[in-house]
Amino acid sequence: MTVVTGSDKTTAATEPFSNGEARGIINTTIDTLSPELRTGDNTIHSNPEEGYEEGLAHKTLTKFLEGRRFAVTRHAYGIDTSFEATFGSGGRQVVFCAEYDALPGIGHACGHNLIATSPLAAFLGAAEVLPKMKVLTQNL
């Protein structure tokens, strides 16, 4: 699970920030990180791990986020394969949930590898655009 946490010290943008500009920043961020996201996705897909046994998937996702200096809590909520990554502090919260377990007998035919990297991409896009929109204060 990834969590984006807002700041109590948010300020409104001094100039209007269009949806098109926001989309452009998000798309550029995701496009830039796409090769690394695909590598993580392929690692998870090629190494299916059933529920509560997703050690490699957990390590792959947390290492990726830690490498980008996000605050990551491994083994969050008393679950060995859960994690929380935060951006900002206090205030509003936006939560992106990721699934990365495989199903018995079919591996990742369920697509959970994609349900891991898609919210990760959304989290990274949000973490890039929100400070530029002055919606969040960046703590990296």
Where are these predicted regions, by residue range?
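Active-site rim/loop-helix segments in enzyme catalytic domains that contact anionic ligands
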Residues: 140
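Acidic/His- and Gly-rich active-site-bordering loop/insert found
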Residues: 2-137
